[in-house]
């Protein structure tokens, strides 16, 4: 599994003008790392074997055809890789967990092998023609699982203290850097994506103050950027804080490490406000699902023509993959933030994946 489908290549081919730096969806670096949890993800892309190189090369070519930079996002799903449970395979995490399915703790040797897998995935990204990799340490995937006390109950060097919980993410960062240096890949971009806090009611995996310490440690490794995954909007703040997440984390970076934030950017006005007041660089996710030429329109002085909302008439211009279309025409968007105007296309939902074992809303994972 893990191959780039024709639908996926077409989807990215239509988004080569979405931005100047194009970051792919996640690729799992180990066979145990995926697929993850929603429709379309049974065909989630992998980069754990050389057999994935052909598709990765096509993907890089599609993204770069208009002169933009292409970055491959690499991750391990950990407990979120429920496709393995469906396929009667082990689901792994830092510690034994009982979710909707059993999750077993990784052994020491498996941890070391996954670290090496991130390096091998980076080497394949270089060979495929990508300009960089983004290490995905957000959204409850394995790197975040090691950092969170909710999913890391280990008592060895990989768990317990904050320093020990940072050990796995930092080991991955160093392995990726080592491989890039060994390959002699000049100007190869390395970024790190993280969720700035993990708080679910009274359950606290970590606070933004702890993740600031992780970021400070990552900055010492001289990465190119930190990418904050924000569900509350680009201007959101931690509860009880006076400053936005963007302002707090930007202050923790040096001049060489840039901050990227994402969240609720659907117009040129919002994009400019974010860059002027909260961050160095913006990432646009759902905005480019609605309008695949989001960035190009701003750069060519046509920002006022950006399409902000979904309509039935506009659907063909979005060029979504079948999985994305099915997810965003569900009334619950599978727990993901909905597309603006999505209620106008709920009647186009086909139900293709509704009974698929992986069609479990994000919040239930």
Predicted regions and their residues:
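Flavin-dependent oxidoreductase catalytic cores
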Residues: 1-365
């Amino acid at each position: 599994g893990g191959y780039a489908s024709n639908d996926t290549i077409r989807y990215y081919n239509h988004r080569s003008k979405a931005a100047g730096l194009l970051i792919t969806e996640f690729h799992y670096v180990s066979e145990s790392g995926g697929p993850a949890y929603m429709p379309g993800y049974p065909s989630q892309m992998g980069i754990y074997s050389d057999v994935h190189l052909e598709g990765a090369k096509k993907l890089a070519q599609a993204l770069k055809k208009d002169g933009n930079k292409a970055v491959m996002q690499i991750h391990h799903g950990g407990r979120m890789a429920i496709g393995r449970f469906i396929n009667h395979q082990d689901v792994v995490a830092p510690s034994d967990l009982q979710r909707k399915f059993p999750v077993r703790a990784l052994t020491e040797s498996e941890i070391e092998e996954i670290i090496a897998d991130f390096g091998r995935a980076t080497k394949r990204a270089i060979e495929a023609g990508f300009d960089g990799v983004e290490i995905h340490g957000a959204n409850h995937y394995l790197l975040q699982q090691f950092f969170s006390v909710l999913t890391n109950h280990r008592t060895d060097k990989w768990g317990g203290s904050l320093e020990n919980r940072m050990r796995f993410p930092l080991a991955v960062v160093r392995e990726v850097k080592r491989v890039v240096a060994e390959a002699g890949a000049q100007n190869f971009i390395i970024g790190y994506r993280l969720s700035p806090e993990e708080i679910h009611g009274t359950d606290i995996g970590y606070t933004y103050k702890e993740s600031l310490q992780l970021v400070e440690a990552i900055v010492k490794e001289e990465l190119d950027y930190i990418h904050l995954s924000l569900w509350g909007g680009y201007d959101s703040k931690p509860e009880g804080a006076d400053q936005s997440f963007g302002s707090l984390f930007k202050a923790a970076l040096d001049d060489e490490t840039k901050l990227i934030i994402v969240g609720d950017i659907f117009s040129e006005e919002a994009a400019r406000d974010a860059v002027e007041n909260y961050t160095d660089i913006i990432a646009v996710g759902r905005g480019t699902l609605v309008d695949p030429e989001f960035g190009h329109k701003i750069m060519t002085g046509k920002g006022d023509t950006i399409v902000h909302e979904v309509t039935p008439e506009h659907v063909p211009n979005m060029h979504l993959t079948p999985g994305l279309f099915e997810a965003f025409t569900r009334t619950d968007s599978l727990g993901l933030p909905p597309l603006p105007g999505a209620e106008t296309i709920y009647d186009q939902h086909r139900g293709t994946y509704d009974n698929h074992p992986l069609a479990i809303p994000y919040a239930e994972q």
